[in-house]
């Protein structure tokens, strides 16, 4: 199963911010979109999410074109999305945040939903926090609950917008472990865009680097991390994984 973008173009006024970008994400792999500020990576990412419509080009999931589908239909097709902004329901408890999504999951029986709740609480290390109001969580705890809640919908793919933003180094390590686990053990495809290239490249299988609206470098993350052009224009000459 694959998400594929073909020849995406986005123009605002007289400026082409995304220029003919094509890429893909398969189930079971972690892929990232990277680039300097203003390069077009976020706009490219949002065209996969469904927040931005391209001027031209197409987006497919499992061979079905979804270019003009709204986000709710993309979710039903198996695409989960975690925004950078705080998306947790602050007045609800941790378990009620997850239950809310589980109750809408038509793929699971009542008993399966109960088991899934316990599984997600345990997997993301928040069982002891299950009765806590979400407003009382730290940044790292909140992010783990948000990922668990997104997984409650049983997606095939997860699109993560700035998953490492606003959390401390220890929490970043925990989130990295969670991302690898959902890819390797659950078989989900994961697409990440983030301003932390070291954390992102260290857990991704493949990377696309965008300059001036165009994908200029792509390949295995370890190769991209050592690419001289990527270091010159984005990563910095002393960058190391």
What kind of feature is each model-predicted range?
Residues 3, 18-20:
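Conserved structural motif at the start of ABC-family nucleotide-binding domains
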Residues 34-36:
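The feature captures the beta-strand-to-loop junction immediately N-terminal to the Walker
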Residues 49:
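Helix-to-loop junction immediately C-terminal to a conserved catalytic motif
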Residues 110-129, 180, 229:
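Conserved ABC ATPase "signature" region
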Residues 133-137, 141:
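Conserved ABC ATPase signature
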Residues 154:
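Conserved catalytic motifs of ABC-family nucleotide-binding domains
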Residues 158-162:
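Catalytic Walker B motif of ABC-type/P-loop ATPase nucleotide-binding domains
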């Amino acid at each position: 199963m694959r998400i594929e973008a073909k020849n995406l173009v986005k123009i605002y006024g007289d400026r082409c911010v995304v220029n003919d970008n094509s890429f893909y994400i398969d189930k079971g792999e972690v892929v990232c979109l990277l680039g300097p500020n203003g390069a077009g990576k976020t706009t490219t990412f949002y065209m996969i999410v469904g927040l931005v419509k391209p001027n031209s080009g197409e987006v497919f999931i499992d061979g079905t074109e979804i270019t003009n589908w709204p986000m709710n239909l993309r979710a039903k097709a198996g695409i989960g999305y975690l925004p950078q902004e705080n998306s947790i329901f602050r007045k609800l408890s941790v378990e009620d945040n997850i239950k809310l999504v589980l109750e809408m999951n038509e793929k699971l029986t009542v008993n399966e939903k109960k088991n899934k709740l316990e599984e997600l609480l345990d997997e993301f290390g928040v069982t002891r926090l299950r009765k806590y109001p979400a407003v009382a969580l730290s940044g790292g705890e909140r992010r783990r609950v948000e990922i668990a809640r997104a997984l409650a919908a049983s997606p095939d793919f997860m699109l993560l917008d700035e998953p490492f933003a606003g959390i401390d180094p220890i929490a970043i390590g925990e989130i990295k472990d969670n991302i690898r686990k959902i890819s390797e053990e659950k078989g989900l495809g994961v697409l990440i865009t983030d301003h932390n290239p070291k954390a992102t490249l260290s857990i991704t299988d493949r990377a696309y680097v965008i300059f001036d609206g165009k994908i200029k470098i792509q390949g295995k993350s370890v190769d991209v991390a050592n690419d001289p052009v990527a270091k010159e224009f984005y990563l910095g000459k002393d960058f190391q994984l």
